[in-house]
Regions:
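C-terminal flanking helix
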Residues: 52-59, 268
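Catalytic-site neighborhood detector that most strongly recognizes the C-terminal catalytic loop/helix
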Residues: 84, 151-152, 157-162, 246, ...
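C-terminal secondary-structure termini that scaffold catalytic or DNA-interacting sites
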Residues: 95-102, 144-146, 182-189, 194-199, ...
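Short, basic (Lys/Arg/His-rich) helix/loop patches that form interaction surfaces
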Residues: 100-110, 126, 181-191, 205-251, ...
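Conserved tyrosine-mediated DNA breakage-rejoining catalytic core shared by Y-recombinases
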Residues: 8, 72-73, 96-98, 126, ...
Length: 279
């Protein structure tokens, strides 16, 4: 709204704010620090929410007279999902992480890279949100034997949808077992994932970016950048392609069936259907 008086801001002004905000930096030759030429939908939603909060506060202070509350909202026309690794890309990332451990210049760097490797393994085979993984404790991981006689692990996960049990893919259990043995000896009551100095993981995005850069797979074929969340999406797509039911995938990931279908339904063709489609 610029220099507009707060009592003059209405729904029309707020709706016009979105295209103005989206295009504001488009013509800048040099961007200010931390500014993005093309703000994300999430940024636009946050800015809209902030503007409405300011107007609401002004109304509570009697600065808007009898003007009605702002009801305008911003909803992206199309929800975007962070890209999911293709199987060959994940394998390439895995091989690169292993090589980076072998070439680490010192003990601290080696430990950081070993942490990234097990962190990537668990998220890619469980669908955890990064925030959920960062809060896991050693005592939240419980061994069990499944109906096929395989040793596996059940996690007690606390996330934005509450507490749930989550099962990791059995293919990861041997490496996880080795890591768990190490963490139980170091700090049996501590965090499952801890930095080399013992502190909580905030984010491993810098380490992941370095590994992706070395692997030559920073972006997918559409130019979309891979992030830590891409591991969660990789899990969802692979599970659906392997024929795991939508309900089971949603429950394990702490998401709704609708979200799983909307976000991943077009990306993941189950093997049985892919076979039929290829006939």
């Amino acid at each position: 709204a610029g220099h507009m008086a707060v009592e003059d801001i209405d729904d029309k002004v707020m709706r016009e704010f979105i295209p103005w905000r989206r295009d504001y930096y488009a013509s800048f030759e040099v961007l200010p620090k931390n500014a993005k030429r093309h703000p994300t939908d999430k940024t636009l939603q946050w800015d809209m929410m902030l503007g409405k909060a300011i107007v609401k506060w002004a109304a509570s202070q009697g600065l808007r007279g009898n003007r009605p509350n702002i009801t305008a909202t911003y909803t992206p026309k199309k929800k975007r999902v962070r890209p999911a690794f293709e199987t060959w890309e994940f394998r390439q990332l895995w091989r690169t992480m292993c090589k980076r451990i072998d070439t680490a210049r010192d003990v601290r760097t080696r430990k950081s890279r070993e942490l990234l490797k097990i962190y990537v393994l668990v998220l890619a085979n469980s669908g955890f949100r990064p925030g959920e993984a960062n809060k896991l404790k050693v005592r939240d991981v419980h061994p069990f034997i499944d109906e096929k006689g395989r040793n596996n692990y059940r996690f007690v996960v606390r996330g934005k949808t509450g507490e749930r049990d989550a099962i990791i893919r059995s293919a990861a259990n041997k490496r996880l077992d080795k890591y768990l043995t190490k963490r139980r000896a170091e700090d049996p009551a501590g965090l499952l994932f801890a930095m080399p100095d013992g502190s909580k993981v905030v984010t491993l995005i810098d380490q992941l970016n370095a590994a992706l850069r070395d692997a030559g797979i920073e972006r997918n074929s559409f130019g979309e950048k891979y992030t830590i969340y891409s591991l969660r999406h990789f899990y969802a797509v692979q599970a659906l392609r392997n024929g795991v039911g939508v309900f089971e995938v949603a429950r394990n990931m702490g998401a709704s069936v609708e979200i799983i279908q909307e976000y991943y339904g077009k990306q993941a063709t189950a093997a049985v259907f892919a076979t039929r489609l290829g006939d």
